[in-house]
Amino acid sequence: MVDGVEEDLKNVATDFKSINVAQLGSIIDYLKGKEVTDVVMIGKVTKEILFSGQHELPDARMIALLSSLKDRSDDTMMLAFVAELAKEGITTFDQTMLLKMIMPKKGVLTKRQPTERENLDMEFGFKMAKALGGLDIGQTVVVKDKAVMALEAIEGTDACILRGGKLACGNAVVAKVAKPAQDNRFDMPAVGVKTIESMIEVKASGLVIEAGRTLIVDREKVLSLADENAITIVAM
């Protein structure tokens, strides 16, 4: 639907069209033209595109929407986008309706169990990530020995892991959770192969996610890569 969508989807989609996310009017016109009344959002559009100056300028409808916002936090922007769709008779559904099967239940997901130190860091990191999410800033925290190494903001999960992992000098624990007031229609927390690759690069040792509320994309590849690199993953 928007820039960044994998091209492979063309092969499995009944209809495929790439539209720059800044072109809100075009997105709505396309959906209405196809008589779409229900949508489910998949993936994430980073706010970085609003500030980089390297992307297509927003259309009149997007400018009007952005100008009406009290702030540009994730929830404020996404709720406004959902409301704009609703004005046109388009309902946005809960992402978990289709993706519940890739949200793991509580437990250790990898072959290696966490150490006592990692367990303590996972509990600490989980709490810190929840607090960060409560401020609607990010969903990821990197910790070591109950000290916060990095908090996710606009840079995204992978950059946060790289920054925090380097500061930790190895054996960091990454926590990724849903916000306390998470709206399941958009921006559900997700981890994937790139998450593990980032952890490998900085020699992070553990990942804790929120059970039943975090998506694992390409689960088999994620767990295999984690096992190969002695990374422990826990759904808490």
Question: Language-model segments: what does each one mean?
Answer:
Residues 1, 41-43, 143-144, 176:
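Short beta-strand segments
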Residues 3-8, 83-93, 97-109, 231-234:
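Catalytic domains of riboflavin
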Residues 44-46, 147, 179-180, 213:
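Active-site-proximal loop/turn and secondary-structure-junction residues that shape catalytic pockets
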Residues 5-7, 47-49, 99, 149, ...:
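Short, active-site-adjacent cap segments at secondary-structure transitions
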Residues 24-98:
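N-terminal glycine-rich phosphate/adenylate-binding segment common to multiple enzyme folds
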Residues 21, 71-75, 91-196:
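Conserved mixed alpha/beta catalytic, RNA-binding, or beta-rich assembly cores of soluble enzyme
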Residues 2-34, 53-66, 158-236:
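Feature captures the catalytic cores and cofactor-binding loops of soluble hydro-lyases/lyases
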